[in-house]
């Protein structure tokens, strides 16, 4: 028999705020309360994807010496001016030239390299050339790549593979970086079980928080997932307090809606402040955006597609902001709708789209719009944002698709 609940026991949404307003408001509040991220020094070889805390300048030049850029012979360029096929020149080893390989030191009096394919061997001590070279031709001078004292990477730069190579070439072995923002993740719900547990009716595998773990890593954070907690006010409260103490921000999975056992809003209000409860997006409306002890605490809906869009629109920019990174927009393509698409009118809707190229143009087809259909995200090539207060789009209409992955032509 269904439980009869007094309406006063249910949560009420404070307000369904427009997405842009909600994001702007919450990020401003987050930034105002943010302290400078902690720093640490790490080996350059282990800093891929980490953000620099300060500018890094080269300690040495690269190359550190004048180096041969080719296999061949090093020569005195001014002494072979004018040689050609009609007037070749025979050179003597140790007097006029030395054999060199790529990377070998070029020392005085030599100042150019003739490529080995332009050298004819006469005997063990002599070669003939019929092609001149310019001063310093085929020589990498000191500092051609990096000059000692040169800026290699600025502060707040997310280090890439090529940056690591340049740092090492510039004599840098360690670099000061911002510690990765630590994000605590609390799965809630009596029905939640870990992946691999024996399944029974009424139980749901916790996949959302594993998705959060992966996304946090992708955006430069360090996830700290806790064991699932049941729908018990005191237990969830203790879990939140522990997570807030141990992390830079906290995500609470499920419990953000208006049910009698959705405790997230009440707990955030008790322990801190609720800035926003309810955003005018579909899926993702029940999002809770708050602060406890000055740290961002975000209540994320339990439906997986809702969870993804709340994460992308709120959690992602908070993580990026903690390390001074830009929230770069996804690439957008123009595509023609394959069929009519009706709007919800009340909300900005994120419609998952399948895209392909037909007859020289992109065509987009909407996938299942349910908030619980994870496979609509897996199969989607992109997202169509359908603004609120419009009736939708007609078949054949051109729309903007935000790409989640490259589209096969």
Region annotations inferred by a language model:
Residues 2-173:
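Phosphate-interaction motifs
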Residues 20-23, 35-44, 49, 54, ...:
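Flexible glycine/proline-rich
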Residues 73, 89-90, 98, 111-113, ...:
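Structural motif
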Residues 107, 161, 258-260, 306, ...:
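Short glycine-rich, flexible loops that bind phosphorylated cofactors or substrates
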Residues 141-252:
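Phosphate-binding glycine-rich loops and their immediate beta-loop-alpha structural context
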Residues 190-191, 255-259, 302:
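Short glycine-rich anion-binding loops that position phosphate/pyrophosphate groups of nucleotides
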Residues 259-271:
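Short Gly/Thr/Asp-enriched flexible loops that form oxyanion-binding sites at enzyme active sites
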């Amino acid at each position: 028999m269904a439980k009869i609940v007094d309406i006063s026991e249910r949560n009420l949404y404070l307000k369904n705020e427009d997405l842009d307003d909600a994001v702007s408001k919450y990020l401003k509040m987050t930034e105002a309360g943010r302290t400078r991220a902690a720093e640490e020094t790490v080996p350059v070889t282990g800093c891929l994807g980490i953000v620099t805390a300060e500018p890094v300048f080269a300690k040495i030049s690269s190359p550190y010496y004048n180096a041969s850029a080719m296999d061949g012979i090093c020569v005195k360029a001014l002494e072979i001016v004018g040689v050609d096929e009609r007037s070749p020149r025979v050179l003597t080893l140790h007097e006029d030239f030395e054999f060199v390989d790529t990377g070998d030191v070029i020392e005085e009096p030599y100042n150019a390299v003739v490529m080995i394919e332009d050298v004819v061997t006469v005997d063990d001590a002599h070669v003939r050339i019929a092609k001149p070279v310019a001063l310093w031709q085929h020589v990498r001078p000191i500092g051609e790549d990096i000059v000692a004292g040169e800026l290699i990477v600025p502060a707040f730069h997310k280090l890439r593979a090529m940056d690591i190579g340049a740092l090492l070439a510039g004599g840098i072995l360690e670099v000061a970086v911002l510690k990765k923002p630590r994000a605590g993740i609390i799965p809630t719900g009596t029905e939640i079980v870990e992946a691999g547990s024996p399944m029974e009716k009424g139980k749901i595998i916790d996949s959302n928080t594993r998705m959060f773990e992966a996304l946090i890593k992708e955006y430069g954070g360090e996830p700290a997932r806790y064991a699932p907690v049941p729908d018990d006010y005191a237990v969830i409260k203790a879990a939140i307090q522990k997570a807030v103490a141990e992390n830079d921000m906290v995500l609470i999975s499920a419990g953000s809606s208006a049910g009698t056992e959705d405790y997230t809003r009440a707990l955030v209000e008790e322990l801190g402040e609720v800035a926003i409860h309810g955003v005018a997006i579909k899926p993702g409306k029940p999002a809770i955006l708050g602060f406890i002890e000055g740290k961002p605490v975000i209540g994320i809906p339990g439906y997986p597609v809702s969870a993804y869009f709340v994460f992308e629109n709120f959690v992602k920019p908070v993580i990026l902001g903690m390390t001074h990174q830009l929230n770069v927009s996804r690439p957008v393509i123009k595509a023609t709708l394959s069929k009519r698409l009706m709007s919800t009118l009340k909300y900005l809707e994120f419609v998952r789209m399948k895209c392909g190229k037909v007859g020289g143009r992109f065509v987009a087809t909407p996938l299942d719009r349910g908030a619980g259909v994870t496979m609509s995200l897996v199969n989607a090539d992109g997202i169509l944002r359908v603004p609120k207060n419009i009736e939708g789009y007609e078949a054949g209409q051109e729309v903007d698709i935000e790409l989640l992955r490259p589209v096969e032509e």
